[in-house]
C-alpha cells in the first residue's frame, strides 16, 4: 500500500494531447490499431465514416472489434452506407480504447474513417521546493483568521489616535497658557475691585478648556476600537471544496469537449487530487465508480 501511495504521489497530472486520425477500409483491407506505449493512455474518438469517390452503389457495413469491460472481444456495427442513399455518417465522437480492429463486413469500399487520437501525457512531477511552497500556500488558505491574531494590527491605529490626542492636548495647553498670560496682564493693569470676578471666570474657562475638555477624548478612544474589533474578529471564509456532483459535472464537460479520463484507478485518483484538490477517499472512490459507467 505504501509503495502504491508513493507511486501515486510521484505521478504528475495528466496533460491531454489531440492528434488527427484517419484510415481507409476495403473488402480485403482492414485496419488494426495497436499501441506499444504503456506509460500514457490512448483513446480514439471516431467522428465520420464516408464512402470514397470510387465506391459502388451497394450496401457497405463498417464493423469495429474491440475488448469489452471484462476483457472479452466484442464486435459492433458502426455504420451502414450506400452511395445513393447515405454516403456519409457522423458518429459524433464514438470513443474506443485500443487495441481494436476496423473492417468492412460487407461491400467493396473504399470507406474512409476519420476522428481524433487522444493521448494523456504525464507531466513531470514538481520539485520538492515547489511542493513545499504549494503545501504552505494551501495551509495558509485553510486557516481562518482567529480573534487573537486580529488584535495585533490594532496597535498602529491606537498609536495614531494617541498621537492625535497628544497634539490636541498640547494645543489646549498652549491655549490655556495664552489665556493665563492674558489674565495676568489684566490683573497687573490698574482696574477696579470688581475686576477680580472676570479673573475667576477666566480661570473657570481655563479649567473648562483644559481639564473639562480632556475627558471627552477617551470617549472617542473607547468607541473606535470596538468597531475595529468587530471588523477584525470576523474570520475569513475558507474556500469550500467542490462537491461530488460539481466534480462530476466538470468531468462530464471535459469529456463532451473530447478529453478523455484516465482508465486506471491510480491515475484516475491522482487526476482527481491534482485537478480538483480533493483528498477525500470516499469522493474519489465514488467518482471512480461513476467513471466506470461512462
Swiss-Prot record:
Decamer formed by two pentameric rings associated in a head-to-head fashion. Acts as a chaperonin for the core histones H3, H2B and H4. Associated with nucleolar ribonucleoprotein structures and bind single-stranded nucleic acids. It may function in the assembly and/or transport of ribosome. May stimulate endonuclease activity on apurinic/apyrimidinic (AP) double-stranded DNA. May inhibit endonuclease activity on AP single-stranded RNA. Residues 121-133, 161-186 have a biased composition (Acidic residues). Residues 223-233 have a biased composition (Basic and acidic residues). GO terms for biological process: cellular senescence; centrosome cycle; chromatin remodeling; DNA repair; negative regulation of cell population proliferation; positive regulation of transcription by RNA polymerase II; regulation of centrosome duplication; regulation of endodeoxyribonuclease activity. Gene3D superfamilies: 1.10.10.2100, Nucleoplasmin core domain (2.60.120.340). GO terms for cellular component: centrosome; cytoplasm; nucleolus; nucleoplasm; nucleus; ribonucleoprotein complex. This is Nucleophosmin. A motif (Nuclear localization signal) lies at residues 153-158, 190-196. GO terms for molecular function: chromatin binding; histone binding; NF-kappaB binding; RNA binding; unfolded protein binding. Residues 121-244 are annotated as: Disordered. The record marks 57, 82 as: Interaction between pentamers. The lineage of its organism: Eukaryota, Metazoa, Chordata, Craniata, Vertebrata.
Amino acid at each position: 500500500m505504501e509503495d502504491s501511495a508513493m507511486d501515486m504521489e510521484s505521478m504528475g497530472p495528466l496533460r491531454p494531447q489531440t492528434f488527427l486520425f484517419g484510415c481507409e477500409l476495403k473488402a480485403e483491407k482492414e485496419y488494426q490499431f495497436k499501441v506499444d506505449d504503456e506509460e500514457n493512455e490512448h483513446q480514439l474518438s471516431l467522428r465520420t465514416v464516408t464512402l470514397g469517390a470510387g465506391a459502388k452503389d451497394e450496401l457497405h457495413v463498417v464493423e469495429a472489434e474491440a475488448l469489452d469491460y471484462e476483457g472479452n472481444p466484442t464486435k459492433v456495427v458502426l455504420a451502414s452506407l450506400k452511395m445513393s442513399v447515405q454516403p456519409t455518417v457522423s458518429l459524433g465522437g464514438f470513443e474506443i480504447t485500443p487495441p481494436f480492429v476496423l473492417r468492412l463486413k460487407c461491400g467493396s469500399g473504399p470507406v474512409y474513417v476519420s476522428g481524433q487520437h487522444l493521448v494523456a501525457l504525464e507531466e513531470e512531477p514538481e520539485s520538492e521546493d515547489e511542493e513545499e511552497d504549494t503545501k504552505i500556500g494551501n495551509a495558509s488558505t485553510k486557516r481562518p483568521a482567529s480573534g487573537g491574531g486580529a488584535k495585533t494590527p490594532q496597535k498602529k491605529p491606537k498609536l495614531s489616535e494617541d498621537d492625535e490626542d497628544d497634539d490636541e492636548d498640547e494645543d489646549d495647553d498652549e491655549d490655556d497658557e495664552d489665556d493665563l498670560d492674558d489674565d495676568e496682564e489684566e490683573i497687573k493693569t490698574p482696574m477696579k475691585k470688581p475686576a477680580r470676578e472676570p479673573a475667576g471666570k477666566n480661570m473657570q474657562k481655563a479649567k473648562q478648556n483644559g481639564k473639562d475638555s480632556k475627558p471627552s477624548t477617551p470617549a472617542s478612544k473607547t468607541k473606535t476600537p470596538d468597531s475595529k474589533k468587530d471588523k477584525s474578529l470576523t474570520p475569513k471564509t475558507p474556500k469550500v471544496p467542490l462537491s461530488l456532483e460539481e466534480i462530476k459535472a466538470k468531468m462530464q464537460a471535459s469529456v463532451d469537449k473530447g478529453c478523455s479520463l484516465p482508465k486506471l484507478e491510480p491515475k484516475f485518483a491522482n487526476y482527481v487530487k491534482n485537478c480538483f484538490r480533493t483528498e477525500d477517499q470516499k469522493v474519489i472512490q465514488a467518482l471512480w465508480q461513476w467513471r466506470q459507467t461512462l
